[in-house]
Amino acid sequence: MCLGGENYLELTELIFIVVAVVVSLFVGGFIGWLIRKSAAEKLIGSAEEEAKRVIDNAQGAAEAKRREAVIAAKEEVMHIRNEVEKESRERRNEIQRMERRVIQKEESLDRKMESLERKEDNLHRKEEEVDQLKEVLTQTVAKEKQELERVSGLSTEEAKQILLQSVEEEVRYESAIMIKDIETKAKEEAEKRAKNIISLAIQRCAADHVAESTVSVVALPSDEMKGRIIGREGRNIRTLETLTGIDLIIDDTPEAVILSGFDPIRREVARVALEKLIADGRIHPARIEEMVEKSQKEVDQRIREEGEQATFETGVHGLHPEIIRLLGRLKFRTSYGQNVLKHSMEVSHLAGLMAAELGVDVQLAKRAGLLHDLGKAVDHDTEGTHVQIGVDLAKKYKESWEVIHAIEAHHGDVEAKTIEAVLVAAADAVSAARPGARRETLESYIKRLQKLEEIADTYDGVEKSYAIQAGREIRIIVRPDKIDDVLAPKVAREISKRIEDELEYPGQIKVVVIRETRAVDYAK
């Protein structure tokens, strides 16, 4: 029982302690809560005061900002209002100015309308007056026409024909004057430019020509050689003539034998062969045949060398070998006494120089100029003109169309379509017409002069004509009562056309029409 009582006391003390501890904790917590509550109330109070102070400050600043914003807004509104009022005033002023201008224009239009109305009224009145005058004039003209027909004895149609004829003559006269002026200006300009180009080309081209004949002279060491050349019963001379086709003329000319023939190549072969025979001294038919054969080969070689030299001097390259050989043959060909190869080379140089002045193809012009008389190398052996033969040869050896065209156009057989063809024709005429370049037989020369004068004398109004300057100029004296100064150029042009159509001549012929009026009286 004692043990149980002690446990009970311990339990009671333990409970008491626990209760005391719990009560202490509760009391301590309550006191702490009171302390924290008091501190919190103090903190809240100070925070409220601070918040109030901040709010008061913020409200003051906001009020100040608001007042500033209100002031700024009022100022902006005032500024905008001033701008709007200023713009409005300007617009009103502009509208007022426009209104004044519109009013002025309306007033001006009104005045113009009134003026137009007055003019229209005047026009109507004048139209009425004109109609009345027309009617009166028509009646007057009809009366005058009847009176004129009665007085003149001519009908209206007859008078009209006379008037038309008079007007036609007047128009023809005026047109002739205009044509004369235009032709004069065009000819002056064309002649000036052509003379300039041709003179420059001629000045830069120096060429010499030797007028060759149909005979060659071979010098002999002595007159005894003539008998050896003739041979027994003339067999040597017959053999040489048979082999070469050349006539040997042995006359009284001392120490010389003449070779005559129209083929220059055969004549050259005969000359070379005869010189070899004379130098060798052995002259008999077999030796003659041998020397003629050697001479033929030498002349053929010389022909080729002459052709090559011509191409070298003119600067024309790429020719077919056969064309080069044909060019060499031209060395022994003459036309009116002018060496054809020298003439072709001169034409090549002139055409090239004129082409350079005009800025066209110089090489093409020189090539066409060199080959323009190629047909003369074989025209003795082939039918046809030298122009057609030259065209055929150029086609055969694949020359260009431009070169072929220049060959066929250089004598005017066809119309020149390229400037190179024109230049070749001009160069050919310049080379042929140069004083001393060519010569004609006396008979053909006289016939040409007579034909020139005959053509001029057949023209109506021509009194007399004279061919001068070796047939390169014809002066025609006309009757002043038949041909006036205006028609004189027409006469010259028509006679020039007839000369071109009916005559063949190298170069050009100047046609001069002379009209002279003389007034003669006698003092008594």
From Swiss-Prot:
Membrane-related topology note: Single-pass membrane protein
Pfam families in the record: HD, KH_1, RNase_Y_N
Gene3D superfamilies: Hypothetical protein af1432 (1.10.3210.10), K Homology domain, type 1 (3.30.1370.10)
One of the protein's GO biological processes: mRNA catabolic process
Signal peptide (UniProt feature, chain positions): none
Keyword Cell membrane (UniProt): yes
Disulfide links within the chain: none
Main location: membrane
Subcellular location: Cell membrane
GO molecular function: RNA binding; RNA endonuclease activity
Keywords assigned by UniProt, alphabetized: Cell membrane, Endonuclease, Hydrolase, Membrane, Nuclease, RNA-binding, Transmembrane, Transmembrane helix
Record EC number: 3.1.-.-
Every HD domain range: 340-433
GO cellular component: plasma membrane
Presence of the UniProt keyword Ligase in the record: no
Chain segments annotated as transmembrane: 15-35
Residue ranges of every copy of the KH domain listed in the record: 214-277
HAMAP family according to UniProt: RNase_Y
Recorded family membership: Belongs to the RNase Y family.
Function: Endoribonuclease that initiates mRNA decay.
NCBIfam families tied to this protein: HDIG, RNase_Y
Name of the protein in question: Ribonuclease Y
